[in-house]
């Protein structure tokens, strides 16, 4: 029985019921006391894989919790589901497609069949095509319409054609190649285009239009704006091919735009947008960091793929993180999850993981179309430390919601300044420690008395200084951010999302909810510009249309 055809209702499994009973046993569990009772707790609940060190000891778990979660994964036939994905089965059931972003990072010589055809030769042909293009640009051989070498590459794309590539190219800035600057244009807001164009020279700018359909509204409008800007700056239609390339499965539309066929990189139906940075969608990454580092990124992801497929569940990073997510969401009532990178270069990882997790697991029906019987994807949010400590960490520490968190931190910085990195690392650890330890009423009172405050003032202030603690977190440590480790980190989160989708019985690889707004947007636009006179479907939308039409000037 295939999970994507007949998904299990995990809530009916014996292990799910056992976990529900176990949750009640842990009602008074305190992590602070657990560390006192078990000096080996850190060693028991931490390990390394693929260049990542995971400490999951600061969680609301005992060893029997992990045993029960692993039992849940086994009863849900997670191993079969993992095998089905890597074997190319059509696990995206609603669209009847395989899910094979993992094929993009497999070595040459491997064999992956889609409809009986081995796709690996085509994968490596495109990688070779990327290698040639990046080499031409970096060596100054790709010239603009005035024969000047390209100095700026602009990626025009949105969603998965933007978030993943932006994350990687900025996370790996220490590896940026000299002579070529990379930029991203995603939003349809004209101000974004204006600000970017003001920093560019049309003679030396290459645009990458990334859209599977070559019809994504925001991307097409920005591509048209870039084309008009290029022509206004002195470029010609005849030389347009020097300044525009495409990543798309709609070759005809890209050619009609003016892009030469040999400069169109393919996309495949078996790679979803939010999983596509490993494909030619990653061209801006390769332009930024060089093709050899891009291949290191692929290698790191491949290493995580191997770990995911072969490591026992109790020592499998994506499996454990996925199980812990289900533990908190379905048994502790957690509705969100914080991503807290303590590294400036990783500042965009939360944006990418928001799409990866929320677009994948933001579902309310199972693979077979029946309603889910459990909670599904959480809200993903967060941001770079230490900034968050002076903003939303207050809610993490003293708010009423249980919000699990992932701390991500490197041991070494590429840019050491005095003892800044030691303080950064210390802040990361102390935040996870504070979430776990908290501060009792007795400790708060003792602290205030030690400052010499009168007893009345101690009693007045003490309740405000109590911090509940017992808030769960994981800490992921890398020695230093590199292409290989970053590839492993991103692939880890991809697989974590898949694990959770299996336990919830949902399809992590479609996104039908995104389409409704697009469809309605066309009607709203027609009414805004006056080409559609019938009123909108509701009074609120029509009122806002009227407000715009009564005030908009140009």
Curated annotation (Swiss-Prot):
Q: Which terms does the record give in the GO molecular function aspect?
A: carbohydrate derivative binding; glucose-6-phosphate isomerase activity; monosaccharide binding
Can you name a GO cellular component term? cytosol
| SUPFAM superfamilies the record matches | SIS domain
PROSITE patterns of this UniProt entry? P_GLUCOSE_ISOMERASE_1, P_GLUCOSE_ISOMERASE_2, P_GLUCOSE_ISOMERASE_3
Q: What CDD domains would the database entry show?
A: SIS_PGI_1, SIS_PGI_2
* Enzyme Commission numbers on file: 5.3.1.9
Q: Which UniProt keywords apply?
A: Cytoplasm, Gluconeogenesis, Glycolysis, Isomerase
List the catalytic residues: 359, 390, 518
UniProt subcellular location: Cytoplasm
The chemistry this enzyme catalyses reads: alpha-D-glucose 6-phosphate = beta-D-fructose 6-phosphate
UniProt entry tagged with the keyword Amino-acid biosynthesis: no
Pathway annotation: Carbohydrate biosynthesis; gluconeogenesis; Carbohydrate degradation; glycolysis; D-glyceraldehyde 3-phosphate and glycerone phosphate from D-glucose: step 2/4
Kindly list the biological process annotations in GO that this record carries: gluconeogenesis; glucose 6-phosphate metabolic process; glycolytic process
> If you read the UniProt record, what top EC class would you report for this enzyme, in one word?
isomerase
Q: Which NCBIfam families match?
A: PRK00179.1
According to its UniProt entry, the function of this protein is described as: Catalyzes the reversible isomerization of glucose-6-phosphate to fructose-6-phosphate.
Q: Identify its protein family.
A: Belongs to the GPI family.
Q: What is this protein called?
A: Glucose-6-phosphate isomerase
According to its UniProt entry, this protein's organism is Pseudomonas aeruginosa (strain ATCC 15692 / DSM 22644 / CIP 104116 / JCM 14847 / LMG 12228 / 1C / PRS 101 / PAO1)
Q: What is the lineage of its organism?
A: Bacteria, Pseudomonadati, Pseudomonadota, Gammaproteobacteria, Pseudomonadales
